[in-house]
Amino acid sequence: MKERRFRLVTSNLIICAVLGLVLASALFALTPETPAAVEANNAVYEGNPESGRVALMFNVYEGTEYVEEIARLISERGWNTTFFVGGKWAEKNGDTVVRLAAEGFELGNHGYLHRDHAKLDAAGNREEIVITEKLLRAILSDLSDEQADAAVPPLFAPPSGSLGNTMFEVCEELGYTAIMWTRDTIDWRDHDAALIAERALKGIKAGDLILLHPTEKTVEALPSILDGIAAAGLTADTVTATLSATANEP
């Protein structure tokens, strides 16, 4: 009897172990790639610490009514910024895209449909990036090639910060740099202007890439953020300038 009970317990333990392995394998298969799982994480998380600059990066798929107010507040300081625009948004807001470029703002690539790039194959990654670039350049067709190159640099901000090996391979193929962030204000979720400003400014330093979105509370927080940047002896500029500039450059 004892031997039979022992065999039964042993069999049950083996079955549980096998089921556990199957479940773990299934969960692993369903889990998207994260930075830790990416073999070669070539994303940029911060700019040049000697630049004297920080970059305010606005990811834009909605909030059109706040975009131009954000641009105005930054322009009033004589500063600059980068708007990472979604292709679908740009398609519906071509006039705003033209005005931003005309005012000297940088327009990065945020994909066309805000898809999870860790789950896309090479064709899907390529399509999202290329369609958005072609769309932006078509909207800005009145610009010279040199002006368009400056306005639409090969910078890609993956939606939701979702990274994958295939995405990096496609970025390299297309000549794009994947841009992440040093600090995330989480303004899309937390509608609290004081909290947004605190997250943007706490421990701020040259080279920081600060992620924001066009929301009502972000606009409310922006004057405090800009004041805090100035108080730290820094200026706000585009991602390109923050990555490459040195303190003695204009």
What are these regions (language model features)?
Residues 1-10:
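N-terminal Lys/Arg-rich, disordered targeting/topogenic segments
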Residues 11-28:
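Hydrophobic membrane-insertion alpha-helices, especially the h-region
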Residues 33-120, 124, 128-144, 148-153, ...:
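Active-site beta->alpha N-cap acidic-glycine motif
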Residues 55-57, 81-85, 106-109, 154-158, ...:
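Structural recognition of the beta-strand scaffold that forms the well-ordered cores
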Residues 122-130, 194, 201, 219:
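Non-membrane alpha-helical structural segments and their capping/turn regions in soluble enzymes
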Residues 139-171, 217:
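Basic- and aromatic-lined ligand-binding clefts that recognize polyanionic substrates
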Residues 162-163, 167-203, 234-245:
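His/Asp/Glu-enriched short active-site or ligand-binding loop at hydrolase and phosphoryl-transfer sites
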Residues 218-247:
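Binuclear metal-dependent phosphoesterase catalytic core
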